[in-house]
Amino acid sequence: LSKRLSGASAVYKLKSNYDLTNTNTLEKLADFTVPAIPNGFLTGGDISPDGKRVIICDYFNAYELILPEKAKNFDEIWKEKPKIVELGTREVGEAVTYSADGNSIFATSENKNSPFIQVKRK
């Protein structure tokens, strides 16, 4: 996922059989935007432990994508509309991840002593 000041971010994929000895070329899968201005300025993201969800954050919110049950592969997740996940107050959101069991989302901001936020999934 590219980080851009304006316009859509691009989603790229590295082949699972990448070559450690040569240059690898990423495949562009999609353009990705969120409702924040300017397009979210995305700062972090994670794939859920079960491989069925993606969480992405910008400075203010998090956005979750859910893989449709009938999807043929994970790449189809990028066709879904992101749903806002409220994280509470963060100064400058920088990181977001799923808990090991996938039942919570953790987030934090940049700088020292930033709060560590936990949001339980419903």
Language-model-detected regions and their locations in the chain:
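Sequence/structural signature of beta-propeller domains
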Residues: 1-122
